Amino acid sequence: NMAVSDINALRSDPQLTVDAVQRGTMYYVAMSMKEAHFANPKVREAVRYLIDYQGINKALMPGYGVLHQRPIKAGMPSTLPDPGYRLDVARAKKLLAEAGYPNGFDTTLRVLSDQPFLNIAIAVQSTLMQAGINAKIINGTGNQIYGAMRERKFDLLVGRGGSGMEPHPHSSLRALVYNPDNSDKARLTNFQGWRTGFYDPQLNTMIDQALLERDPQKQVADYQAIQTRYDQLVPALIPLSQMVDSVVVRNEVREYQPHPSATTFLRDVYKVREGEKG
């Protein structure tokens, strides 16, 4: 939870090394489709164009994340190029008017009190307001914020999630998109898709089938088709940045290898005294 200025200051210390480790976890803006406004795909699409992705990543995310707008982590063979969404207030206003909200509406935006979450929420609040969506920020602890999401009792939320122990498209899709049972009684709280009320049986089937596909080229094509359909459905969860872990290591530490799934083994790590060669 260090500030960007703190990370940059540590980079200038000759006794330290700062490693940037790209994770598969996504920072996102989530909407609850249990809430009437966001059940409307035109409203969700309006929100898509009321996020300053480029500005947020340039100003707020150095040391925390890099611009990424797909549910599958960057750099994998199956990952499609970013769709290139940008802040477009005029387009968002038109969509809101078509949805029946020409003057916008009031809502709430939940967010952790930690950085960079809070600064992201403030930035999103500002651009939502330009189209008449007045989002009151509710900040708190993980239990308060993600707890409300697990209970499906929220409007908008800035959060982070996805990926898994292994770098595979299914890990990301299972965490962020998959929702096999959208009923309240299912209580599938591990699935962000269930938390947001986003449900598409065809997409679920595509995800199941892609995992079992044995031909590597066909599997890549399957995962790309999933991303295309997900985008076309105007989902309730909008990825905006892929997480970067900034790991600070003193120069006397040897054999420390940061891991993208936070599973670094410490058994081979050791420290040398000043003047010794390691």
Where are the regions that the model predicts?
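Bilobed periplasmic-binding protein-like "clamshell/Venus-flytrap" ligand-binding domains
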Residues: K58, E98-P116, L156-E166, L211-N251
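Short, solvent-exposed loop/beta-turn-alpha elements that line the ligand-binding surface or hinge
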Residues: A9-V21, A30-N40, A74-R91, Y101, ...
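Extracytoplasmic
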Residues: D13, G24-M26, G104, P235
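Append "and occasionally in soluble cytosolic enzymes with long acidic Gly/Pro-rich linkers
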Residues: A39-S126, Q130-A131, G197-M206, R214-P216, ...
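Short beta-strand-to-loop elements that line the ligand-binding cleft
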Residues: N1, A20, L109-V111, N134-T141
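Ligand-site clamp/hinge motif
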Residues: N1-L10, Q125-S126, N134-K136
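A ligand-binding cleft/hinge motif common to bilobed small-molecule-binding domains
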Residues: A3-D13, S163-P169
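Periplasmic binding protein-like
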Residues: T127-K185, Y230, A236
